[in-house]
């Protein structure tokens, strides 16, 4: 099984958590694209979706899945999204695709977070994948200095503007032993919109694509 086939298996496995007549929260990324393909097969059975990025919105609309603004939706039964890293406590690093803020907002609304990954994303300790931080542009240098004080090595992701019009600093060389604490510390820096640690709101169910099939962790 190739890595993409493992992603596809995890994406399709998430369909079992989609409730009939519900509005589904949908994340962003290569694994989620497989989930969107799967979701299109039952678009007649759901009311539609809320998306965490312009890219996912475009893909869903092209497949005929109705996409709603989050402000017009009271609740979501599930949010399905991938991760760049996930540990044994269901804490994640997300935001490799720069959609972390919208992903975090949609995840906060959903009753259940279903994380879909291939087996390369499982780690014991978060931090080998650089931690994305969304920053208001004028605060870039200040925030970078504060991130250095926290032990990180921030690098400006050149040429990337988020869907919210902000920039991304990728923080390298962090061994993240206390994800919740670090998530709060970084979010407390003035000028930070949010960071890619999903620890205060981690995953509820993990679906891992492996060469032997999909493994479920709860």
Swiss-Prot record:
Enzyme category, top tier: isomerase
CDD domains, A to Z: RPI_A
Catalytic activity: aldehydo-D-ribose 5-phosphate = D-ribulose 5-phosphate
EC number annotated for this UniProt entry: 5.3.1.6
Pfam families per the UniProt record, alphabetical: Rib_5-P_isom_A
Pathway: Carbohydrate degradation; pentose phosphate pathway; D-ribose 5-phosphate from D-ribulose 5-phosphate (non-oxidative stage): step 1/1
Active-site annotation: 103 (proton acceptor)
Coiled-coil ranges (or none): none
Transmembrane segments: none
One GO cellular component term noted in the UniProt record for this chain: cytosol
Keyword Isomerase applies: yes
Keyword Membrane part of the UniProt annotation: no
Disulfide cysteine pairs (residue numbers): none
Keywords from the named record: Isomerase
UniProt-annotated binding residues for substrate: 28-31, 81-84, 94-97, 121
GO biological process assignments: D-ribose metabolic process; pentose-phosphate shunt, non-oxidative branch
InterPro entries referenced in this protein's UniProt entry, alphabetically: NagB/RpiA_transferase-like, Ribose5P_isomerase_typA_subgr, Ribose5P_isomerase_type_A
Family statement: Belongs to the ribose 5-phosphate isomerase family.
Subunit structure: Homodimer.
HAMAP family: Rib_5P_isom_A
NCBIfam families per UniProt: PRK00702.1, rpiA
Designated name of the protein: Ribose-5-phosphate isomerase A
Organism for this UniProt entry: Shewanella piezotolerans (strain WP3 / JCM 13877)
């Amino acid at each position: 099984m190739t890595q993409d086939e493992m992603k596809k298996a995890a994406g399709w496995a998430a369909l079992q958590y989609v409730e009939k007549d519900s509005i589904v929260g949908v994340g962003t990324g290569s694994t989620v694209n497989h989930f969107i393909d799967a979701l299109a097969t039952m678009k007649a059975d759901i009311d539609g979706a809320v998306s965490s990025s312009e890219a996912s919105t475009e893909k869903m609309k092209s497949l005929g899945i109705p996409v709603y603004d989050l402000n017009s939706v009271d609740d979501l039964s599930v949010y399905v999204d991938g991760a760049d890293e996930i540990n044994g406590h269901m804490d994640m690093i997300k935001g490799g695709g720069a959609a972390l803020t919208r992903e975090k907002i949609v995840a906060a609304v959903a009753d259940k977070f279903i994380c879909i990954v291939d087996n390369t994303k499982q780690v014991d300790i978060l931090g080998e994948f650089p931690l994305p931080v969304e920053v208001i542009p004028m605060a870039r240098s200040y925030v970078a200095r504060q991130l250095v004080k926290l032990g990180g090595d921030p690098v400006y992701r050149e040429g990337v503007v988020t869907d919210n019009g902000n920039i991304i600093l990728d923080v390298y060389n962090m061994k993240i032993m206390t994800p919740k604490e670090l998530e709060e510390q970084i979010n407390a820096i003035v000028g930070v919109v949010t960071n890619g640690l999903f620890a205060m709101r981690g995953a509820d169910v993990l679906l891992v694509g492996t060469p032997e099939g999909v493994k479920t962790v709860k």
